[in-house]
Amino acid sequence: MTIRPLHDRVVVKRLEAEEKTASGIVLPGAAAEKPDMGEVIAVGAGKIGKDGARRPLDVKVGDKIIFGKYSGQTVKADGEELLVMREEDIFGIVEK
């Protein structure tokens, strides 16, 4: 199943969380926090402004992003957990 987001929404796959703390303690799955970084896997066509013009999104497929811990709606597609969120919930793009 493929999810095609509408308007200013993006579909994000969370990046794997670290399973060890900085001091080397291994965290069990339930104790590890969900990561607040992910990779954009699909983008909508853009938000329609008051003038009727469509504004394209600043993020694109493949971008690594940072978002709020409670951002977006969790959905499952083909057994994979994904997030659907608005572009405004994205704090920034991680550049190398």
UniProtKB/Swiss-Prot annotation:
Gene3D superfamilies xrefs: GroES chaperonin
Domain of life per record: Bacteria
Protein location: Cytoplasm
PROSITE patterns from the UniProt entry: CHAPERONINS_CPN10
Pfam families: Cpn10 (PF00166)
Coiled-coil features, chain-numbered ranges: none
UniProt keyword terms in alphabetical order: Chaperone, Cytoplasm
SMART domains per record: Cpn10
CDD domains: cpn10
GO molecular function: ATP binding; metal ion binding; protein folding chaperone; protein-folding chaperone binding; unfolded protein binding
Single GO biological process annotation from the record: chaperone cofactor-dependent protein refolding
Gene Ontology CC terms, in alphabetical order: cytoplasm
Function, in words: Together with the chaperonin GroEL, plays an essential role in assisting protein folding. The GroEL-GroES system forms a nano-cage that allows encapsulation of the non-native substrate proteins and provides a physical environment optimized to promote and accelerate protein folding. GroES binds to the apical surface of the GroEL ring, thereby capping the opening of the GroEL channel.
Family label: Belongs to the GroES chaperonin family.
Subunit structure: Heptamer of 7 subunits arranged in a ring. Interacts with the chaperonin GroEL.
Protein name: Co-chaperonin GroES
Species whose genome carries this gene: Neisseria meningitidis serogroup A / serotype 4A (strain DSM 15465 / Z2491)
Source taxonomy: Bacteria, Pseudomonadati, Pseudomonadota, Betaproteobacteria, Neisseriales
